[in-house]
Structures are given as structure tokens and as C-alpha cells.
């Protein structure tokens, strides 16, 4: 095939412009990115060769080589990994269909101050243009005799040519270095001492040897330390941090490091990290998660989901097992009893680590909770076996103070007359903390949990009770706040109010029969005229709202709620004297107000605003007389 010249798509041009012109500092990270890609290519070849042994060349020994040449001002990074077909070269280098590269460009402002983040976005190859004005890539896919040469000057075009690679399978990247001025303070990346120090700094933990010719013979520059096989006492904090950064491309420090060896019926080594911050793509649909799996130090796969439950997807790290078969596949993993045992063990270790953090470093745990609490809560509805451990890790806002509380702390503060653990759900703290549903509970001094994560609706359903105390929504019917003596005292008052307000109750029931199940007197309101509550068997209004956002309807229709009215509010005394037409309008206004109070949308906002305007005019007219 004759040599072709093609244009990068518009987004690649934009990305290259950012890399070439915006990332002024830390130009040295290009080497880390290219070495990491080379290591991944070798890992992929090793993994594919488990099922296709013929892919491996005879006497194959994995290695990455650096060949600097100060005379020609070039640096070659050579690997004998899986290589690429021409189609893959175009897909991975010439276009930008991946979300990571798009996200990289969206975060351009942050990239100017933190260029080391580039690897998180899967576009580390382009960092070569930070130091080179021409990049040549020569690659050949394992199992193929066809090679591809890709070349670009970062100017918006690239060339493609079909040329067999003399070395066979693998990839060679040749960087034709830029001429930097002395004031740019850029290191000489064709200097062997500089390259040695950069490999030590960024890539010492890469599992494959990184080689370069010394004075008389080829030298291995990296230690290839399998940190997880060492005793924890032999590993420094700095080494743990460096390995975490190598593994995750997260250049913050991990919040917690867990390094242990499991022995007994199932033996394996594990090195786990709890991050301090969410990665950029956390919870995106295409986000990969899971631990890296090694078997007898042989890399098998990254992002092995079977080693962790989804609610611990923020945990990073690896497991190295001596007992699993090297021929294991992703499909077989799901059915492997030993993998199930590893998952159980790793889950227990992760949860006990978080419990330890909560107990000993509350402030750090609260920071963790801000980042990953909503994810951890997903375990309550999905992992019954670990329900007790998970419920002890929960933190919630409450009416007690600005500080978050555990369930244990809440129970310890409960008043003697308080029967249940009370909670309210909603969209935001400001909404629920000012809710009229709290009126009676504040009056009695009862603490209420303020639940504002969407997952909380499923959490309270799964939890139902804690240490013998029932969880009770204050937005449901049957809220029992009074003692036996208080009930007895109020019973006569309630009966009298039902008689007095019977015309209002009947009028409202008739007006709102298509909107509510019933209209009854309320025990929970002190200042607000009315509210809506869910019956015990129905979903809350907030749950219905969430289901609608997910594109699901509950039982195919909006579920009616019960309207409670405050018999002591003066509006109902006025309604008793109002005409039937006025009672109808006021009932509609009270229902609309109750919808707003619970955080629901109005079915007819225009009608509501007109009714409020009419009331204002009537109020103004009455003051004239």
C-alpha cells in the first residue's frame, strides 16, 4: 500500500494543541506515559497467549528498551508487546472516539496546572509531542506479518505506510526531540543519566524489565519489585505511594493502604488502596472498576469485577493468588469457588479498614464519606451478608447539629419517650432541614436524620430497623410521637375538631378526590396548614420522583397520598365561613402548597399563580373596608 497522508479529526487537533502549547511544566512525564503503554502492551500479549500460545515468538522474553542518541537527537522506546494493526493505529491514535480524551479537553484549565493528570484520560501517547516535534511509530500485531508506520509532526496530519517491522511483533516509538532553549529548563532526554533517573522516579514498579545500553553491556533500569509479595514491614510509605500512583495514575496520596497475606484454605496476597478523591470518570457508564488479578505473579487482567462487590468499586489494588489456574477466563471467574472466597475475604478486609478509619480518624473518614459514601450505601440493599458491618459505617446529616452522625450515635442521643428512629428524604439539605414535616418533632426535641442521597430511599427500605429501633419516615401516615398520657389528653380535642371541621373535611375530600386518598386531621403540624403523607404500603413522593427520573413509573401511575390538615391553623376557621366556591379554590391552593412543601412539581403552575394573585387582591380589598 502506498504511503497515505490523513488529517486528524478536529478533536485530536484540539488535544494536540493543548499538549504542545499549554503543558509547560513536567515535560518529563512523557516517558512515564510511553513506558506505561509499553508495559500494558506486553501484559496484553501475555494474557492473549494463555489461550493462543502461538502468538508468542520463540524464546520470547518480555522487555522494554530505551535507545537514546544524542547525535541524532532521538529517543526510541521499544517493546515486544502485542502491537497494533493499521486499523487499531487509526482508531487509537488518529481519532478520538473515547470519552477519556474528550474529558481531558474539557478539563483543559486544570491540566495547565496539573499536567501529570494526562495518563488518567487514556491519552498519554500524545504527551510525546511535549518534547518531540516529530513522532514515528512502527508497530506489528502479534500473529500478523504486516507492519504499520505512523508518523506525525503534531501539525494536524499524519502519514500511514505498510512496512513490516524487522523485529516482528511489538512497537517502536521514535521521538525526534525539539530544540529547547536554555531558559526553558528542560532536561536532555537523550542523556542516559537523565533517563535512568526518570525511570527510577516514575516507572520503577513496572513489572517488565526496562533496559538500556550502559558503558559495556545492557542494563536493567527498574527494580520490577512485586511489592505485594514483600512483608509490609519491608515496604516504605513512599514505595506504597509510588506504586499506587503507577497503578491508578492518581497523583494524590491514597487515604488508606491495606497490604496483607491470606493463609489457610485459600492463599493469596492483596494490596488494596482506598483513594482520597474520586477519579474524573467516577460512575460514568463506561468506567471500569475492580482489582488487578495476578496468578503466581503473572498478570492476568485489570479491572477484575469478580474480586469486589460493586459498592466497593472505589477500592484500587491487586490480588495475587497461588491457587487459581493460569488458564482462567473472565467467564470462568464468575463460577470459581476460590474467587468467591477471595472476594469475601477482600470485602471483609476493606470494610474493617473503613471501620478502623471511622473509629480512629473521624475527620478523614468524613472526607472519604463525602467522596464515596453514596457508593458504599449501595451495599445495604445488595449485600445482606454484610448488612451489620455496612450499617455501622453509615453517616447521615441530622437535625441534632451540623456534624454528621452514625446510627449508634443517634440511638445514644434518643430521648426516653422517643419510640423510633426518624428520618426525612428529599433532594437537598436546605429543603429537608426547613421542612414543615419537622415541626412537631422539633417541638418535642426528637432528632431526625436528613437523607438527601438518591440511594437513601433504598437504604432505609433495606435497613428497616437498627438495634431494635424501627426506622420511621416522618412523611408517612401513622407517625406516633405522643406518650399514652398525651394521646389520652388529645383524643377529646381531636374528636371535637373533627366535629367542628367536618364541613371543611367533606368539602376538601370532594374537591381533591382525584388527587388524594383521604383528607384527615394532622398530629404532626404546628405552624403549617397542610401536608401530604404516603400510606404505609406506598412509595414516598421522593421515591416516585426518583423512579420517574429513571424512566420508571410506580405501578403504572402516580400514587395518591393522604392529605393531613392542621386543625389549629386559622385558615380552616376562615374556610368554615367561606362559600362553597371559595372552599374549592382554597382546597386546591392548600393541595398545591402541600405539593411544594414535599418537593413535588405542581400539575398546573399557571393556575396556582392565578389563584394566589386572586387571594392577594381579596386580601387587599378586605383591608380597605
Curated annotation (Swiss-Prot):
The Gene Ontology CC terms held by the record are: cytoplasm
Q: Where in or outside the cell is it found?
A: Cytoplasm
- Region annotation (B) maps to 331-545
Annotated stretches, region: A: 1-330
InterPro entries, per this entry?
HATPase_C_sf (IPR036890), Heat_shock_protein_90_CS (IPR019805), HSP90_C (IPR037196), Hsp90_fam (IPR001404), Hsp90_N (IPR020575), Ribosomal_Su5_D2-typ_SF (IPR020568)
* Residue numbers spanned by region C: 546-625
Organism's domain of life? Bacteria
Q: Which parts of the chain span the membrane according to its record?
A: none
Keywords linked to the UniProt accession: ATP-binding, Chaperone, Cytoplasm, Nucleotide-binding, Stress response
**Molecular function per GO:** ATP binding; ATP hydrolysis activity; ATP-dependent protein folding chaperone; unfolded protein binding
User: What is this protein's function per UniProt?
Assistant: Molecular chaperone. Has ATPase activity.
Q: How does it assemble?
A: Homodimer.
Provide the protein name: Chaperone protein HtpG
Task: Specify the species.
Answer: Bdellovibrio bacteriovorus (strain ATCC 15356 / DSM 50701 / NCIMB 9529 / HD100)
| Lineage summary | Bacteria, Pseudomonadati, Bdellovibrionota, Bdellovibrionia, Bdellovibrionales
